[in-house]
Amino acid sequence: AGPRWTKLETYRVLDGAFPQQIRACDGYIVTGSAAGVYEEHSWIDPLMAFIREAYDADIPLLGICFGHQAIAQALGGEVVKWPDGWGVGVKPTRFERPPVAKAELPEDAVVKLIYFHQDQVTRLPEGAERLASSDFCDVAGFTLCTTDGVQTVLCLKGHPEFDAGYSTALLDSIESKVGTDRTKAAKATLAKKTDSPLVAGWIKQFFTTSAQRLGCAA
């Protein structure tokens, strides 16, 4: 077997762009968004339907922040705007178990990621298992498996793709919403090292293992 290459396709669902066939890709990532899953946008319901179709077809799904919430809501969970406001900056998250079979966790099971959210999952879909939590966010991640134990869903509240520079600019752009004191405190955390490389490895392992076991990898 030669080297494998990963090809990424981008679909701007907010513009109504979805894959023409559910099996157009071996797996899907539902990314972050400025929108809330409970808001009335023309693309929200089609996205919910797409997530359900992919899940029913056992196609691996990764949800990050908004994606974490969208997958939860689409599959029967509940998402609300959190009354305590925004969770921003680098935050430690306690993992209850490895996010993927045989994945490595730090010795203390605490993973640091950058967070940007004002919404939270308050009820998980039926059959989902909580993966992680923090002092600010009770459901900071969850997983779902098929009836024969193949993991098809990995959802994370934190942003492994964010870095300090981008996060600083984003905080500046939403300071009026987050509040000056909370923005200042969040910026102070951005000097901390995150575990994004570790989480990136988990994500690669999740898609590779799930797609191979389900027989949907090319």
Describe the predicted segments one by one.
Residues 20, 39-40, 72-74, 125, ...:
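Short glycine-/acidic-enriched loop or helix-start segments at secondary-structure transitions
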Residues 23-25, 42-45, 75-79, 127-129, ...:
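Short, glycine/charged-enriched secondary-structure capping and boundary segments
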